[in-house]
């Protein structure tokens, strides 16, 4: 058995702090992140883009199940700062509560510089065309941000799991993304994060450094390394089967 971790230890090390035997460490390989591509036929024409040929900021929570706080924070920034220079396109995701989708859509309908969709079957094209991305930092979205080299503002969840926060914190330290933590931006007695903090970050986002400006060896080599590891494992399997007198189909071979 082997353990393959689809990332890099300098970005996120899920084994850190675990008292694991050396045998486990020797079986562990970090592959790098999985490079994504826009699917054939999914490239967006200007007429199909949310704002035509105008740049936009993509706001996505992936599946969307716990994206309420992030969506509300970004939306309040646009509601209170009508001079935001770049419009926003919200993709709520299939798992955001339908009542919340309706509430957000009603607020968005009152704004000229915000549009939304519940879900799109080709989110890669929308992300690749965006001037910047606001996201929670789940694994799949991070792979898309890195693959399409988009300036990104990550708003990670901190409860009940810290996975997104830990990944985003380290990526910010490395200069790959910027991060805003809602709990750190709360003002007064309100638990809501300050819309002005978000509005400032949104204004700066399109001019933010893109991830490729930071050299991280092997960052997006995941698919290549997985293929290599599969070939190695298959070679071991074939060698093992040969030793017990079987060919690659598992049939018994004759011996004299």
Located regions from the model:
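Membrane-proximal helix-turn-helix segments that form the acceptor-binding/catalytic region
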Residues: 1-3
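Short, conserved active-site loop motifs that form the nucleotide-linked donor/cofactor pocket
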Residues: 28, 113-115, 177
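Donor-nucleotide binding loops and adjacent catalytic segments primarily
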Residues: 8, 12, 18-19, 33-132
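Thr-Gly-centered strand-to-loop micro-motif
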Residues: 60-61, 91, 135-136, 155-158, ...
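Nucleotide-sugar donor-binding patch of glycosyltransferase catalytic domains
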Residues: 151-207
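C-terminal amphipathic helix plus adjacent low-complexity
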Residues: 196-256
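A donor-sugar binding/catalytic signature common to diverse glycosyltransferases
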Residues: 121-165
């Amino acid at each position: 058995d082997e353990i393959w971790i689809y990332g890099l230890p300098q970005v996120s090390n899920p084994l850190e702090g675990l008292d694991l035997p050396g045998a486990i460490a020797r079986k562990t390989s970090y592959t790098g992140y999985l490079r994504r591509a826009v699917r054939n036929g999914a490239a967006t024409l200007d007429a199909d883009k949310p704002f035509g040929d105008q740049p936009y900021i993509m706001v996505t929570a992936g599946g969307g199940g716990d994206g309420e706080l992030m969506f509300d924070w970004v939306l309040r920034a646009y509601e209170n700062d009508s001079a935001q220079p770049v419009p926003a396109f919200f993709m709520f995701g299939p798992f955001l509560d339908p009542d919340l989708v309706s509430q957000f859509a009603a607020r968005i309908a009152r704004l000229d510089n915000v549009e939304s969709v519940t879900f799109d079957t080709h989110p890669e094209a929308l992300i690749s065309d965006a001037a910047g991305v606001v996201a929670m930092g789940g694994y799949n979205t991070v792979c898309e941000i890195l693959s399409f080299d988009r300036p990104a503002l990550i708003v990670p969840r901190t409860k009940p799991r810290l996975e997104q926060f830990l990944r985003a914190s380290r990526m910010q330290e490395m200069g790959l993304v910027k991060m805003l933590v809602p709990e750190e931006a709360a003002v007064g007695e309100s638990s809501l994060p300050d819309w002005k903090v978000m509005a400032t970050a949104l204004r700066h986002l399109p001019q933010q450094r893109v991830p490729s400006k930071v050299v991280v060896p092997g960052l997006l080599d995941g698919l290549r390394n997985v293929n290599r590891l599969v070939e190695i494992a298959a070679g071991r399997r074939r060698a093992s089967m040969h030793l017990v007198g079987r060919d690659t189909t598992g049939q018994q071979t004759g011996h004299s």
